[in-house]
Amino acid sequence: MSAAEVADHYNNVRQAGIQDRKESRIFFMRNMNNWIKSQLINDAMKLVNENGVKSPVVLDIACGKGGDLRKWDITGAKHVVMADVADVSIQQAEERYKTMHKYPHDIFGAQFIVADCTKENLDDKIEIKEPFDLVSCQFAMHYSFVDEDSARTFLKNAVGKLKLGGVFIGTLPDADRIVWAVRNGTEGKFANDVCKITYEKVDELSEGNVPLFGAKFHFSLDEQVNCPEFLAYFSLVKHLLEEHDMELLFVHNFAEAITNWLVPGRRLLESMKGLETFPNRNLSGKTDEEYLEAKAKIDSLGDNVPKFVGTLSKSEWEAICMYLVFGFRKKKTTEKNLESEAPEIKKVTPVPLNEDTDKTAEKNEERIEEKEENPSHC
Ligand SMILES: C[S@@+](CC[C@H](N)C(=O)[O-])C[C@H]1O[C@@H](n2cnc3c(N)ncnc32)[C@H](O)[C@@H]1O
């Protein structure tokens, strides 16, 4: 699978209309993914602010159609470089940027670059001379793990121009979790109502045989045609990034990240419609098994409490648990690295609805208009 084929795939992904997205079986999961990115960027900005930077220079590497442009606006970015191998996606990102309400006044500067970040030197194309304060790579880095050279080039492009103390954040499939799922499935396949994961070479799945690079799998969500992806073991990602003086700040499976962000990010999660109300007459999952946790939560609620919870169907939750979030920082000194802990998969936590709004919600969250036209996972 060459980067050109990846580009071809993403260039041809149809832009779903608002109505299509609302009717999608994974409507809430997509919104949840989008909320996770918002929370991650929010946390990264706190670290960037600690460096004394209020208006960061940002690189959004493998930015797709620019689904995070609004988030960059909210961070108060000074300049954002958006790079992707898919030219049509970059064109759409640039068009979106131009329709943003403040354009061309009072909005961050931006550069849109078409580049295969596994082969080309991005630095040759970047116009701004300042180093980056923040780099974001959402749902994309693993494509570069097709082979070692590609992964190394991609990571160099990602963090090579990051300033000392600068932050690198991202999301990617959790290789351990995926291998676990396909090993426990049938003939290298894991499937539920919303996602299907197939590991291509089943004989590689025996203990110790999954290669570090080129471990190809197919991940299809909501029956969308997918393009092949590659496992990126987090310990390997960490190792490769350490060669660029990057130190690990955190890594969490999505389940763990959601639990951590539920209190500070609850208001935003509700406004972004990241949870489905249970019970309701038009649930996206069609069997009782999809909502056993939510049902148990409802049954445990005392009297005089509204009998509604916010939840995700079991299948969406299983799919979301296939991903992790991470944050690294370029070392300022020779501080000792923080060690990553093995991510533990928690159960879906249904959230009682109609309670007082969380007071600690970030003021930025109120400003997000949830009209995102391209929520991830794309
Ligand atoms: C799942 S999409 C994520 C898009 C965006 N980051 C988001 O969160 O919505 C993966 C993106 O990675 C891009 N990509 C894959 N391989 C790439 C490469 N070699 N160089 C640059 N971009 C690449 C694809 O074109 C696609 O836009």
Curated annotation (Swiss-Prot):
Residues 335-378 are annotated as: Disordered. Its main location: nucleus. Pfam families: mRNA_G-N7_MeTrfase. PROSITE patterns: RNA_CAP0_MT. This is mRNA cap guanine-N(7) methyltransferase. Its EC number is 2.1.1.56. GO terms for cellular component: nucleus. GO terms for molecular function: mRNA 5'-cap (guanine-N7-)-methyltransferase activity; RNA binding. Residues 24-331 form the mRNA cap 0 methyltransferase domain. InterPro entries: mRNA_G-N7_MeTrfase_dom, mRNA_G-N7_MeTrfase_euk, RG7MT1, SAM-dependent_MTases_sf. Keywords: Methyltransferase, mRNA capping, mRNA processing, Nucleus, RNA-binding, S-adenosyl-L-methionine, Transferase. It comes from the Eukaryota. MRNA binds at N33, N34. It catalyses: a 5'-end (5'-triphosphoguanosine)-ribonucleoside in mRNA + S-adenosyl-L-methionine = a 5'-end (N(7)-methyl 5'-triphosphoguanosine)-ribonucleoside in mRNA + S-adenosyl-L-homocysteine. GO terms for biological process: 7-methylguanosine mRNA capping. S-adenosyl-L-methionine binds at K37, A62, D84, D116, Q138, Y143. Residues 335-347, 356-378 have a biased composition (Basic and acidic residues). Belongs to the class I-like SAM-binding methyltransferase superfamily. mRNA cap 0 methyltransferase family. mRNA-capping methyltransferase that methylates the N7 position of the added guanosine to the 5'-cap structure of mRNAs. Binds RNA containing 5'-terminal GpppC. The record marks K65, K71, R96, H142, E229, Y323 as: mRNA cap binding. It is an enzyme of class 2 (transferase). It comes from Caenorhabditis briggsae. CDD domains: AdoMet_MTases. It is found in: Nucleus. Gene3D superfamilies: Vaccinia Virus protein VP39 (3.40.50.150).
